[in-house]
């Protein structure tokens, strides 16, 4: 295990105490808001540091008691009994502190752009893409996040050939970022008379939602085309050219949005374009650090098959961490915290292992 950065811990405690004192002194509203934000950010790690310091002091007292020949038998027995419990507590706190001190992904607190596309499997793939979107919608609702569809192309038998949505809320990207990749489904389609199991797939991409401050899109780098919005069966929704297609000339990225308002369409298309460019920049930076990777979870390879949903067995398997759960019905209703937490824990463990290697 990596060593705890004692100096950094002391500095965090010192800063936390300074913030507490300044908040108690009655600063202006603007200053108070900034202090409160930093306070809430530091509070989890400082509370663990204080618990760790208390436990290490307790262990030192136990060691002194056991080393003192004047300690009577009852007290010695009690100290011997408490020692392993305190040592176990210290070990757990060390790991929690190390995780809290891991470098933060700058995008973790952002909202996200969720893109789901039907892959191999025809109509069944589109239906599965629809099921995945519903799963994420339910999950978002359970977290108090807001989902807004930016564009959707429906499948002939239902579901979606493609659907793009924003998922807005604090920390959305940190919870959904490991969902990117190929999701495979094994089930008997409703139209299958013989009861044969079919395999199909959908691709999920989760991008951190970029703001104008994150990525600068120059006007001369984009081409904006307008066209008529189409409804079901290709019927024109209105007589105006409201749909918008934006092409980013340097990269060739094309984004479309086809709601009724041209102004809204341009804003939504720019929102997706910025996020894709921001994601490209993040992936470029990640690939430069790829030699440091210790976990499949964080690879972000969207062509990688990451998960299988086997409906006949009620089984979900995440292939990156060899996790299998037999509660597929509940997970399709949005109860995916178990797999999200396991993926996050695996990623954190890999980062801790890397930190330990660098210190050796």
From Swiss-Prot:
Annotated gene: prfA
Highest taxon above the source species: Bacteria
Family as reported in the entry's similarity comment: Belongs to the prokaryotic/mitochondrial release factor family.
Pfam families according to UniProt: PCRF (PF03462), RF-1 (PF00472)
HAMAP family tied to this protein: Rel_fac_1 (MF_00093)
Name assigned to this protein: Peptide chain release factor 1
Primary role: Peptide chain release factor 1 directs the termination of translation in response to the peptide chain termination codons UAG and UAA.
Source organism per UniProt: Rhizobium meliloti (strain 1021) (Ensifer meliloti)
Swiss-Prot/TrEMBL keywords: Cytoplasm, Methylation, Protein biosynthesis
Localization terms from the record: Cytoplasm
Presence of keyword Protein biosynthesis: yes
GO cellular component, one term: cytoplasm
InterPro entries xref list: PCRF (IPR005139), Pep_chain_release_fac_I (IPR000352), Pep_chain_release_fac_I_sf (IPR045853), Prokaryotic/Mito_RF (IPR050057), RF-1 (IPR004373)
UniProt-recorded Gene Ontology molecular function terms: translation release factor activity, codon specific
SUPFAM superfamilies: Release factor (SSF75620)
PROSITE patterns: RF_PROK_I (PS00745)
Modified residues (N5-methylglutamine): 235
Principal subcellular localization: cytoplasm
């Amino acid at each position: 295990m990596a060593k705890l950065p004692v100096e950094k811990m002391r500095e965090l405690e010192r800063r936390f105490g300074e913030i507490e004192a300044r908040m108690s002194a009655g600063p202006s509203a603007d200053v108070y808001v900034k202090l409160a934000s930093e306070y809430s950010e530091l509070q989890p790690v400082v509370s663990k540091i204080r618990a760790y310091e208390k436990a290490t002091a307790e262990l030192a007292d136990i060691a002194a008691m056991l080393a003192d020949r004047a300690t009577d038998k009852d007290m010695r027995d009690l100290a011997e009994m408490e020692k392993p419990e305190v040592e176990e507590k210290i070990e757990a706190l060390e790991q929690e502190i190390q995780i809290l001190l891991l470098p933060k992904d700058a995008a973790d607190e952002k909202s996200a752009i969720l893109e789901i596309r039907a892959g191999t499997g025809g109509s069944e793939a589109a239906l599965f893409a629809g099921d995945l979107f519903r799963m994420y919608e339910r999950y978002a609702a359970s977290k108090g996040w807001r989902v807004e569809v930016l564009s959707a192309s429906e499948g002939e038998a239902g579901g979606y050939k493609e659907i793009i949505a924003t998922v807005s809320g604090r920390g959305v990207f940190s919870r959904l970022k490991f969902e990117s990749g190929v999701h495979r489904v094994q089930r008997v389609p409703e139209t299958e008379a013989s009861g044969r199991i079919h395999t199909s797939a959908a691709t999920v991409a989760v991008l951190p939602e970029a703001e104008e401050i994150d990525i600068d899109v120059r006007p001369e780098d984009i081409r904006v085309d307008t066209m008529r919005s189409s409804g079901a069966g290709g019927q024109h929704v209105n007589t105006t050219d409201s749909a918008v297609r934006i092409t980013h000339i340097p990269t060739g990225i094309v984004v479309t949005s086809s709601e009724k308002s041209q102004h809204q369409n341009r804003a939504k298309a720019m929102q997706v374009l910025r996020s894709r460019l921001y994601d490209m920049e993040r992936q470029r930076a990640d690939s430069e650090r790829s030699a440091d990777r210790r976990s499949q979870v964080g690879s972000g390879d969207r062509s990688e098959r990451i998960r299988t949903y086997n409906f006949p067995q009620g089984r979900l398997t995440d292939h990156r961490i060899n996790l299998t759960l037999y509660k597929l019905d509940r997970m399709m209703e949005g109860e995916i915290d178990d797999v999200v937490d396991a993926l996050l824990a695996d990623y954190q463990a890999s980062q801790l292992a890397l930190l330990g290697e660098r210190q050796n």
